[in-house]
Amino acid sequence: MSFRLRYAPSPTGFLHIGNTRTALMNYLFAKHYNGSFIVRIEDTDLARNVEGAIESQFENLNWLGIYPDESIFNPNDQKYGKYMQSQKFDRYKQLAEQLVDQNKAYRCFCTSEELEKDYEDQTSKGIIATKYSQKCLFLTQDQIQKNLENKKEYSIRFKVPKNKTWTINDIVRGDVSFDSKDLGDFVILKSNGVATYNFAVVVDDYDMQITHVLRGEEHISNTPRQMMIYDAFNWNYPMFGHLTLIVDNTGKKLSKRSGNALFFIEQYKKQGYLSQAIFNYIALLGWSPPGEQEILSQNELIKIFDEKRFSKSPSTFDMVKMKWINSVYMKKLDDDKYLEFVKSFINTNKFDITSKSETWLNHLLLLYKKELEYAEQINDHLDLFFNKNTLDNNTIDVLNNLTNYKNVVEIFKNQINVLKDWTIENIKQIIKDTSTLANVKGKDLFMPIRIFATKSEHGPSLADVIYLLGKTTVLNNINSLER
């Protein structure tokens, strides 16, 4: 059997961590078994569809390295039908009417007001799990015909079998059972002719010969309704699997309101995360590789993927770990690719890099290669080289706690003043000579030099920073602070 798995987004929003994880796990599952990964669009909720959402979904999937074998852009319509639900209305209607003819579904002429009153009556009686009253199930043929002649609007409801239990061997959770007594007759075709989610998704999965349905746990409650529809048509079920929730650091479901994490993939792109790093990290949400290694390429993940290693517990989205993994991938870039990538994230409205040579800028950016968690972070470090810094009270307190810092600075300044050949090696030698002449080392040596020469407590290699700032700037910094 050739495995066929799908990711089926609705164009009601943009690609985020949750549906990226769904797409990615289906992709790994399919590719591990040399199967097919399909992307189809569930766009029947016309009122909520967002312009540009479909294009954005595909653009971001491709950016992550997730390329569908079949989609609206590379369909196999002749064999598997359409890849957008809005192009299958006739198919859904024909199958819904077929179930009516077979007495497995029926026309419901109840208005929304009647349904609302019915549910309110049930709630007032203490019924929590309200169900449809089946009022229209018992209409006579004459009553039905009269309603049709009067052009009364109707939906089509599925007739839930009585006293039946369905059990699935969930890929993630093991055996899960559902009882028909917990479910009321549900709509499969709305009065406007649009199929409901549970009906359309079954038809689509059957038409596309989907073998495994791997999705979020919020869909567990949909599964029994879908199994009933499979049974009604005498179709075989796919294998079902329901991935556990992704939660934020407070234990709540990750969402765009989660303050500690970026939610949308587009946000990561704009901040300068690498697609390979995001793919790697999201693959670890609710799934664990064998062994201790966590930095894994797409090909490695495909090779070692095992559906038995899904977690049954919620996975916590850890922004610190996401940043760490991205920093590992940043370090792995060769210097040319790193420079090209990071330069594209420099805020040129704030920092005039055109006034500097390419050699100077490359030297500066490479100083931070081992420090950056994401590319846009470079802007946090550039004030040191482009803007005039001022010392805060904390930095002044640091100086006052050092041994004889004024003497250290004076010795260093005098040597810098007479330095003719401005090289990193010569600057390192001056720092070394200052240590000997002032009889200090460690923090008592480096901190006063760094603060006075660069006007900052922190930074990368001191000699490199001094070299990049230039002799004039370094002496101006020292003189301004001495005053």
From Swiss-Prot:
The keyword Nuclease does not apply. A motif ('HIGH' region) lies at residues 9-19. Its main location: cytoplasm. Gene3D superfamilies: 1.10.10.350, HUPs. It catalyses: tRNA(Glu) + L-glutamate + ATP = L-glutamyl-tRNA(Glu) + AMP + diphosphate. InterPro entries: aa-tRNA-synth_I_cd-bd (IPR045462), aa-tRNA-synth_I_codon-bd_sub2 (IPR020751), aa-tRNA-synth_I_CS (IPR001412), aa_tRNA-synth_I_cd-bd_sf (IPR008925), Glu-tRNA-ligase_bac/mito (IPR004527), Glu/Gln-tRNA-synth (IPR000924), Glu/Gln-tRNA-synth_Ib_cat-dom (IPR020058), GluQ/Sye (IPR049940). Keywords: Aminoacyl-tRNA synthetase, ATP-binding, Cytoplasm, Ligase, Nucleotide-binding, Protein biosynthesis. One of its GO terms (molecular function) is ATP binding. ATP binds at K256. One of its GO terms (cellular component) is cytosol. It is an enzyme of class 6 (ligase). Its EC number is 6.1.1.17. It is found in: Cytoplasm. SUPFAM superfamilies: An anticodon-binding domain of class I aminoacyl-tRNA synthetases, Nucleotidylyl transferase. A motif ('KMSKS' region) lies at residues 253-257. GO terms for biological process: glutamyl-tRNA aminoacylation. HAMAP family: Glu_tRNA_synth_type1. Catalyzes the attachment of glutamate to tRNA(Glu) in a two-step reaction: glutamate is first activated by ATP to form Glu-AMP and then transferred to the acceptor end of tRNA(Glu). Belongs to the class-I aminoacyl-tRNA synthetase family. Glutamate--tRNA ligase type 1 subfamily. Monomer. This is Glutamate--tRNA ligase. It comes from Mycoplasma capricolum subsp. capricolum (strain California kid / ATCC 27343 / NCTC 10154). The gene is gltX.
